[in-house]
Amino acid sequence: MSQKNDNFIDKTFTVLADILLKVLPATKEEKKAFSYYRYGMSAQSSGDYAEALENYYEALKLEEDPFDRSYILYNIGLIYGNNGDYSKSLDYYHQALDLNSRLPQALNNIAVIYHYQGTKSSEKKEFEVAQNNFDKAASYWKKAIRLAPNNYIEAQNWLKITGKLSETEIF
């Protein structure tokens, strides 16, 4: 059922995007950038990450709007994170945030990576490194929650359980 919904959403997005491209005033370059972005999203949703990255990189070459660039960079970060390249993923999330500081999903994903790295360090008995990563995770989750207080419930619970949420920090 979920796959059907995802496909319906993808098809709906594609139809709407085509309509918007025809009716909204946009330069040829903007339209081309958006087409690459759209193809990148389609490839990403079907799991073709190499194709998605190719399209996103082409979109980045053409897209000038910082807000739109932030979402392209965010999606590139998602792909690298899904492939386990957390260093590149973090780099692209930070680039996205440099252009658009109001991306709670990027903040959340950064926190998830730091939490994962903290867990791995803890398993290796590298407790100081683990604590540092958990502190970073807490910091990014707090920022994400401030932007989207009704989201990231698991993160809010983790912050409370671990004592990383002070009594004055209520969302």
Curated annotation (Swiss-Prot):
TPR repeat spans: 33-66, 70-103, 118-151
Membrane protein topology class: Peripheral membrane protein
Protein's organism: Emiliania huxleyi
InterPro entries named in the record: PSI_Ycf3_assembly (IPR022818), TPR-like_helical_dom_sf (IPR011990), TPR_rpt (IPR019734), Ycf3/AcsC/BcsC/TPR_MFPF (IPR051685)
Protein name from the UniProt record: Photosystem I assembly protein Ycf3
Any matching Pfam family: TPR_8
Family according to the record: Belongs to the Ycf3 family.
Top-level taxon of the source organism: Eukaryota
Cellular component per GO, a single term: chloroplast thylakoid membrane
NCBIfam families the record matches: PRK02603.1
PROSITE patterns to which the protein is assigned, alphabetical: TPR (PS50005), TPR_REGION (PS50293)
Keywords: Chloroplast, Membrane, Photosynthesis, Plastid, Repeat, Thylakoid, TPR repeat
Principal subcellular localisation of the protein: plastid
BP GO terms, sorted: photosynthesis
Function, in words: Essential for the assembly of the photosystem I (PSI) complex. May act as a chaperone-like factor to guide the assembly of the PSI subunits.
